[in-house]
């Protein structure tokens, strides 16, 4: 964690982790910390978003301080790579999976039992298209996707040419916005700034300049407390609607809103059967999006 937090902030952050860990500890049964078996090493995968970092380091604190575990943190990319790593025993636990990464990549691993879903982490995730509230006040029709039609040029950027810019998310995230734009018949060019920090830098700069910006975003996310953002209403979901643009299918099949996601905890089959006291703790782990955002905000500085 030393690469994430400067020395001047380490002690306050340790106190925050301790406080968050206490809240998590109180939320689970005392039996989660029982058992004579030694904990051993637990490998937790930290994904690239801030909420996952908060999950990982609060759990790490509890497991090390209360159960005597040795916790190793990995950073394997969301999707197929981390399901394969879990199958191969390189990852024991993931504390925030967005519905088996939103697509088909994880389903075979769950079906064959090599990856075990052990319940919700207590948080519901939302993905969508977002604009600043100041823009909605100027253009009330932007409340829905239909209001964007014919007004795309308002969002023009150097990269988008004559089209409006839609700022896509971190390329490692499962998304469908290229297909969604096509399916809705909107005149946007999908532009990628890079990983999430680069995307945030781009849209937050435009926000501070009070310029138009439309972008992929999600909740919970601690930055949502710092920026007044509004989710654009997309078409309602329909049977057969697709959510991963890597899936085959006509663009019309992607022309619906993202679903809400119950954020699951996952374990490898080997770890789930290990008898480690950490297994019981992870199964019982839950906290709120408010708690997660609070810790994520402090970690991010």
Predicted regions and their residues:
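C-terminal region of N-terminal signal peptides and the immediate post-cleavage residues
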Residues: 24-38
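Short, polar/charged alpha-helical segment
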Residues: 51-69, 181
């Amino acid at each position: 964690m030393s690469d994430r937090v400067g020395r001047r902030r380490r002690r306050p952050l340790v106190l925050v982790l301790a406080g968050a860990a206490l809240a998590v500890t109180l939320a689970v049964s005392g039996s989660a910390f029982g058992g004579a078996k030694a904990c051993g090493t637990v490998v937790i995968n930290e994904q690239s978003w801030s909420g996952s970092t908060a999950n990982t380091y609060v759990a790490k604190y509890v497991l090390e301080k209360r159960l005597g575990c040795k916790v190793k943190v990995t950073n394997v990319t969301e999707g197929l790579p981390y399901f394969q790593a879990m199958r191969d025993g390189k990852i024991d636990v993931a504390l925030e999976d967005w519905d088996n990464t939103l697509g088909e990549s994880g389903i075979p691993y769950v079906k064959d039992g090599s990856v075990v879903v052990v319940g919700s982490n207590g948080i519901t995730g939302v993905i969508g298209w977002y604009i600043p509230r100041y823009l909605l006040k100027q253009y009330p029709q932007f409340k829905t996707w239909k209001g964007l039609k014919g007004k795309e040029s308002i969002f023009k950027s150097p990269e988008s040419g004559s089209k409006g810019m839609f700022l896509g998310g971190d390329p490692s995230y499962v998304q469908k916005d290229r297909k969604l734009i096509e399916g809705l018949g909107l005149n946007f060019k999908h532009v990628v700034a890079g990983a999430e920090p680069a995307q945030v830098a781009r849209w937050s700069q435009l926000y501070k300049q009070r310029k138009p910006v439309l972008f992929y975003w999600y909740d919970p996310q601690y930055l949502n407390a710092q920026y007044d953002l509004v989710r654009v209403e997309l078409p309602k979901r329909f049977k057969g609607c697709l959510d991963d643009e890597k899936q085959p299918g006509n663009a019309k099949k992607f022309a619906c809103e993202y679903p809400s996601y119950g954020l699951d905890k996952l374990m490898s089959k080997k770890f789930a059967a290990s008898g480690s006291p950490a297994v019981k703790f992870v199964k019982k782990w839950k906290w709120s999006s408010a708690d997660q955002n609070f810790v994520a905000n402090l970690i991010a500085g």
